[in-house]
Swiss-Prot record:
Pfam families: KH_dom-like (PF14714), MMR_HSR1 (PF01926)
Keyword Nucleotide-binding among record annotations: yes
Protein name, per record: GTPase Der
CDD domains: EngA1 (cd01894), EngA2 (cd01895)
Domain KH-like: start-end pairs: 358-439
Record-stated family: Belongs to the TRAFAC class TrmE-Era-EngA-EngB-Septin-like GTPase superfamily. EngA (Der) GTPase family.
Residues noted as binding GTP 2 in the record, renumbered to the chain: 187-194, 234-238, 300-303
Protein's job: GTPase that plays an essential role in the late steps of ribosome biogenesis.
Lineage: Bacteria, Thermotogati, Thermotogota, Thermotogae, Thermotogales
EngA-type G domain mapped to chain residues: 2-168, 181-357
GO molecular function annotation: GTP binding; ribosome binding
Annotated organism of origin: Thermotoga petrophila (strain ATCC BAA-488 / DSM 13995 / JCM 10881 / RKU-1)
Length: 439
């Protein structure tokens, strides 16, 4: 699919333009500079034509900190790979040295560029005071738009499509491929989620720095591994609710993380092996389990653990004790930074997804039920007649009983264990239970 990149200095309205073109609020929009840190992408569909649109972080002329430096580095690398660039400038304030510096880079990169003047609600003032100086950037006639007020966006999209087709790119809409495994990478801030994301993709796509909170928008990427399609999503770090101020960028980011979990098939829960398992790690795992998503747990930064060769059993025991509610998850010890065991993470994702989509025959369930009930004492008066699997993603089982009121948590634990031990292990997948009264 053709790729169109939105670039520009901070706060010229790139994310607002992105949201309007993809027709959904996907990129975070705030008045604060530098809100978008990781590239955010989605598909634009226009009268049977489609292309991928990518919103990038604002490019600072002279980045003053490691995050800004990384933001600029990621954006400049993506410019070189794009089919077309939308260079967005402020149509109210005119051009600055930052605009001129970015324009110089775009010209040297020899990438096809459309100059977009945003915030041109007052078109007459724009044409009189700002438009003449835009020609000096070297990209010809600018397209004036107001992303916030949906002005001239149709002209912009039609220009994009014409430019892409002139390059011989195929923009015809194709049926959506739905067989991709959707994987969300989640965890506390600074546990190495973006490093793992980049290690899987074998390229720097998400920002990586030692400063917690570097990732704000979920970053997604399609990738084929051994002929299988995946969509990986790197998410922002989740802190405790009490530590997150309301109506802030971080609060919006947390909503996006939960949304990414709900859209995923498999969630990779990343832990920092140098810090063990915290209460917040448990909360995140509980969120994944309650949302009914398959899961893989990874202890990252294993290379930094002292005497690690002798401590696998210790950490495995810790996992079983603290993550008892998701102890069906494969546990992998990795170093994302050094590339250790990344292949095992992929294998675990495949295993979890296979479990998540498995459906077992009713005969196997009821055979196991009869066998185990022969030597099991149920609560007085409770009878379990038979069961069947009624759904996948997650595997969901319906049991017919004489009294739903007598089904308490111990009976649910018993039935899940019966299924895993005697029918199918469902490694990496939660099991949901439903009950129906029967005589």
């Amino acid at each position: 699919m053709a790729t169109v990149l939105i670039v520009g200095k901070p706060n010229v309205g790139k994310s607002t333009l992105f949201n309007k073109l993809v027709r959904k609020k996907k990129a975070i929009v705030e008045d604060e500079e530098g809100v978008t840190r990781d590239p955010v992408q989605d598909t634009v569909e226009w009268y049977g034509k489609t292309f991928k649109l990518v919103d990038t972080c604002g490019v600072f002329d002279n980045p003053q900190d490691i995050i800004s430096q990384k933001m600029k580095e990621v954006t400049l690398n993506m410019i070189r790979e794009a089919d077309l660039v939308l260079f967005v400038v402020d149509g109210k304030k005119g051009i600055t040295k930052e605009d001129e510096s970015l324009a110089d880079f775009l010209r040297k990169s020899n990438v096809d560029t459309i100059l977009v003047a945003n915030k041109t609600e007052n078109l007459r003032e724009f044409e009189r005071e700002v438009k003449p100086e835009l020609y000096g950037l070297g990209f010809g006639e600018p397209i004036p738009v107001s992303a916030e007020h949906n002005v001239n966006l149709d002209v912009l999209v039609e220009t994009i499509i014409r430019k892409l087709e002139e390059k011989g790119l195929d923009l015809e809409s194709k049926p959506e491929i739905t067989d991709a495994i959707k994987v969300a990478i989640v965890g506390r801030p600074n546990v190495g989620k973006s490093t793992l994301f980049n290690a899987i993709l074998n390229k720097e796509r998400a920002l990586v720095s030692p400063i917690p909170g570097t990732t704000r928008d979920p970053v997604d990427e399609e990738v084929f591994i051994d002929g299988r399609k995946y969509v990986f999503v790197d998410t922002a770090g989740l802190r405790r609710k009490s530590r997150v101020e309301p109506r802030t960028v971080e609060k919006y980011s947390n909503y996006r993380v939960v949304d990414s979990i709900e859209k995923a098939d498999v969630v990779v829960i990343v832990l920092d092996a140098t810090q063990g398992i915290t209460r917040q790690d448990q909360r995140i795992a509980g969120l994944v389990e309650r949302r009914g998503r398959a899961s893989v747990v990874v202890f990252n930064k294993w290379d930094l653990v002292e005497h690690r060769e002798k401590r696998y059993d210790e950490f495995t025991k810790l996992f079983r004790e603290k993550f008892y509610f998701v102890d069906y998850s494969p546990l992998i010890f990795i170093s994302a930074d050094k590339g250790w065991n990344i292949d095992k993470v992929i294998d675990a994702i495949n295993l979890a997804y296979a479990s998540y989509t498995t459906k077992v025959p009713s005969s196997a369930i009821n055979s196991a039920l009869q066998k185990v009930l022969a030597f099991t004492n149920l609560p007085r008066g409770l009878k379990i007649f038979f069961g069947l699997q009624v759904d996948i993603k997650p595997p969901t089982f319906l049991f017919f009983v004489n009294s739903i009121e007598k089904i308490k948590n111990p009976q649910k634990v018993f039935l899940r264990k019966l299924i895993r031990d005697y029918v199918f292990p469902f490694e990496g997948s939660p099991i949901f239970l439903k009950f129906k009264r029967s005589r």
